[in-house]
Amino acid sequence: MVFIDNIYADEVLDSRGNPTVRATVILSDGTKGSAIVPSGASTGKREALELRDGDNRFLGKGVLKAVENVNTKIADELIGLSPFNQAEVDATMKDIDGTHNYSNLGANAVLGVSMATARAAANSLQIPLYRYLGGANAMTMPVPMFNIINGGEHANNSVDFQEYMIMPTGFENFNDGLRAVAEIYQHLKKVIDFMGESTAVGDEGGFAPNLKSNEEPISVIMSAIEKAGYKAGEQISIALDVAASELIDEKTKKYVLKGENRELTSAELVDYYADLCSKYPIVSIEDGLSEDDWDGWKILTEKLGSKVQLVGDDLFVTNASIVAEGIKKGIANAVLIKPNQIGTVSETMQTIRLAQRNNYNCIMSHRSGESEDAFIADFAVALNCGQIKTGSTARSDRIAKYNRLLEIGAEIGYAEYLGKQPFSKK
């Protein structure tokens, strides 16, 4: 019987040059798996806790405490367990930690080991990670939610909304869809350069021009779609990540759009979204309101929920109990899936199953601080998420996921690509 023989971690760097945890699990048959944990910039209040050292190293962002927890507390309890019982491995770490948000061990320590265990198990069986996690049912290639213009916390410009994305919804396969958005990205660079604006990129590879309003990036993207020879609405759709929790004034409870020098109530912001959706082929809005503004989310869902995918990121933080509450109250209709928000592979899978049972779409997602680790590419296919959010075709930490998806698609051969289908039920 194969068992976990050794576990260790070390401190490596993410795409922003900040330290993060790399965990390695070695099995008794000699196979091993490693995983690098991502980190977010715009984070929800109820996310699992990322353990940082808080000393002088790396401006306080070192992760040696988390590394030590892997090498001692976690390793001591997991060595001898079966790597093929992911639920037991993850539950054991949760028991060791003893808190609801992994504040003792650190979610970055726990997730690294959880992911590395899954990878080691797949390697031991000599099957791809997506096949190990998803079985024979893993057959859906995700539609990319492709970051093309950055604002908010992800860029140093005057645009308030955090991400403007395009989605290749009018194509029959992943490869053609990826080609289309990659070509549009190159044309957008030319459009922005012609405008005399910077073509510097943000954390996730999208451009970060200093535009005049929150609507202007959409019109600029529409121009790039046309110049690339594609049809907006028919082949290419638009998605927004507002990250509204970063915009709200906690005292006035109004949303501050600094780039436009105005403040809006929840209802006014919903009307603003409705106006944008009437002008442009917007199919998805993420975190359109603050994570605490559930009354506002109710207004948003009632007004746009039948027409647009309304995604909860900070709202749900990949937490099954919070998603269940949202389902009960009729809030949003989709869940962004970030494994490091909840802490383990098993808990992430639980949240996805709950969402899918209740007809909520799932979008597998990276974080703004990433690495060469492409675990989420396999994870998205394994659980038939149907959508993935993993940046643009710039920065190798984002490209790693797309290249892995191309590899997976070639291996599967018969893979499905849902295109517009995730949005047709809205």
UniProtKB/Swiss-Prot annotation:
It is found in: Cytoplasm; Secreted; Cell surface. (2R)-2-phosphoglycerate binds at residues 162, 338, 367-368, 389. The active site is at 204 (proton donor), 338 (proton acceptor). Keywords: Cytoplasm, Glycolysis, Lyase, Magnesium, Metal-binding, Secreted. GO terms for biological process: glycolytic process. Binds a second Mg(2+) ion via substrate during catalysis. SMART domains: Enolase_C (SM01192), Enolase_N (SM01193). Pfam families: Enolase_C, Enolase_N. It catalyses: (2R)-2-phosphoglycerate = phosphoenolpyruvate + H2O. Its cofactor is Mg(2+). Its main location: cytoplasm. Coiled coil: none annotated. It is an enzyme of class 4 (lyase). Mg(2+) binds at residues 241, 286, 313. Pathway: Carbohydrate degradation; glycolysis; pyruvate from D-glyceraldehyde 3-phosphate: step 4/5. Its EC number is 4.2.1.11. GO terms for cellular component: cell surface; extracellular region; phosphopyruvate hydratase complex. GO terms for molecular function: magnesium ion binding; phosphopyruvate hydratase activity. Catalyzes the reversible conversion of 2-phosphoglycerate (2-PG) into phosphoenolpyruvate (PEP). It is essential for the degradation of carbohydrates via glycolysis. Belongs to the enolase family. This is Enolase.
